[in-house]
Amino acid sequence: MNTSDLFEQIPSKRRSLKDLATYIKTKSGNSPNYSIFLGAGASVTSGISSGTQLVEEWRKEIYELSSSSAYTDVKTARQYLIDKESSWYDPTNEYSSLFQKKFDLPAQRRRFVEKQVDSKLPSIDYSYLVSLFQSAYFDTVFTTNFDDLINEAFYQFSRERPTLCAHDSSIKGVSVNSSRPKIIKVHGDYLFDSIKSTLNETESLEINTKEKLIEFTKKYGMIFIGYAGNDRSWIGPYISRHFLSLYPLLVRRRRYSRGERYPSALCGCHSL
């Protein structure tokens, strides 16, 4: 389901950034109304390649190797992969299928991720987000990212120390009612062997992670930042069945190039 489909099916749920800022600000005591969900786009301003950038790079490389032809355009490359490489290529989930093709072994994928995130530091945008946690507008962030930027941001910009859950076994004990900042890594951490990036890996979440995510979305709204929803875990069916019926929806869809700042998402919220 893409943005246009959502706007067409539930136009009454569409909200502006100004509306969102009002919803965030209107809360009772220190209890927030929303949790944050960070995707790969949230790390672009820290110098980490976005999923879109990696897909473009891998598609070109694999097309040229497979076809023995020079890369000309996206449409030609995609059609070739659909026609000739359908045994592994999934056009609806290019990131995972291309990632698995390029890095066949889990150890290779982990080393690639480690190289991507090595020495990267939180951008100023993360300081805005941390300040919102300090003001009790949020207390939980879910993320599909393997980097440690949000955790490092708390140590760099705040005296608060978050609870970090980077493995399924550590998630079960997280309390939805705790006011301490919580970071829950949906796909794991690159330091563990169990990171989830390929098609089969992202099709299923560990049971504790899935249950905790459902528990939080029943109590809080969810604000997505930099997340395209291209994994095949819970996002499609769960949102369709539950999430859209529980909370108003704000959809903001755009691509970020390397070094581009968030135009208003975090900075706008900071004006609270």
Report each predicted region and the residues it spans:
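Conserved catalytic-core helix/loop/strand module for nucleotide-ribose chemistry
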Residues: 1-221, 229-272
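Extended basic-aromatic, gly/pro-enriched interface segments that bind polyanionic ligands
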Residues: 226
